[in-house]
């Protein structure tokens, strides 16, 4: 599902005009996997620009909370999407639309709901606030389901990423630390490149 490495840059873009400069910065830094959130009015325009750019990213769309969001994902030909929860209506429709949906889980009940809808991957979110890898181990043990695969997101930075990188059930780590909103808004591409390098070398 992920390309080249486990790092996913989670992006909240408020000004779509910065999209291509941001894309170039990340791509040149070795960041290929993106989770672009549908959190702002200009998110969709930003996603379209990056998707249709010369940069060959592996794009997932985050904060998918409605059927309208799902149809947007489908319209762009994007194969997977994230949500912060396990909304049954969204899970059911994602299956019908052949979208690889990655719902947010933080406890065993969430896992059971997601597995019923054939979710291959689960988003462990918010990872740090939920108790980090220790809590994830408890969830895995309680589930009694073999080969659960997770993408961890929420509060992960260069300081605490190591346990997530080493965990055998975690196939990807999403972080907004690489390109925080303030860095994007101020066009601080130098700092974004620096942070990308730090995580890719972790």
Give residue ranges: language-model regions:
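Conserved N-terminal beta1-alpha1 strand-loop-helix module at the mouth
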Residues: 1-79, 86, 96, 158, ...
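Hydrophobic faces of well-ordered beta-strands that scaffold small-molecule active sites
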Residues: 6-11, 34-36, 59-62, 81-82, ...
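Hydrophobic positions in alpha-helices of CheY-like receiver
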Residues: 50, 94, 139-142
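Short, charged, surface-exposed secondary-structure boundary motifs
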Residues: 71, 90-94, 111-116, 132-137, ...
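Glycine-rich phosphate-binding active-site loops on the catalytic face of alpha/beta enzymes
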Residues: 80, 84-90, 123-133, 169-188
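Histidine/lysine/aspartate-rich catalytic loop segments that bind and position anionic ligands
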Residues: 91-92, 96-130
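A contiguous pocket-lining binding segment that forms or flanks enzyme active sites
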Residues: 118-123, 134-136, 141, 146-148
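C-terminal output/effector regions of signal-responsive regulators
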Residues: 139, 147, 158-164, 169, ...
């Amino acid at each position: 599902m992920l390309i080249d490495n486990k790092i996913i840059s989670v992006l909240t873009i408020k000004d779509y005009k910065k999209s291509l400069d941001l894309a170039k910065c990340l791509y040149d830094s070795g960041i290929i996997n993106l989770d672009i959130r549908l959190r702002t009015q200009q998110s969709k325009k930003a996603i379209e620009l990056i998707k249709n750019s010369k940069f060959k990213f592996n794009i997932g769309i985050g904060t998918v909370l409605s059927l309208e969001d799902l149809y947007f994902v489908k319209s762009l030909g994007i194969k997977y999407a994230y949500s912060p929860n396990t909304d049954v209506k969204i899970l059911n429709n994602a299956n019908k639309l052949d979208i690889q949906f990655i719902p947010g889980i933080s406890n065993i009940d969430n896992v059971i709901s997601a597995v019923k809808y054939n979710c291959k991957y689960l988003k462990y979110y918010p990872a740090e606030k939920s108790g980090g890898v220790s809590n994830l181990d408890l969830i895995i043990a309680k589930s009694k389901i073999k080969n659960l695969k997770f993408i961890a997101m929420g509060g992960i930075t260069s300081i605490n990423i190591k346990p997530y990188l080493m965990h055998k059930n975690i196939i990807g780590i999403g972080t907004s630390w690489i390109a925080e909103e303030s860095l994007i808004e101020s066009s601080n591409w130098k700092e974004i490149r620096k942070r990308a390098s730090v995580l890719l070398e972790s």
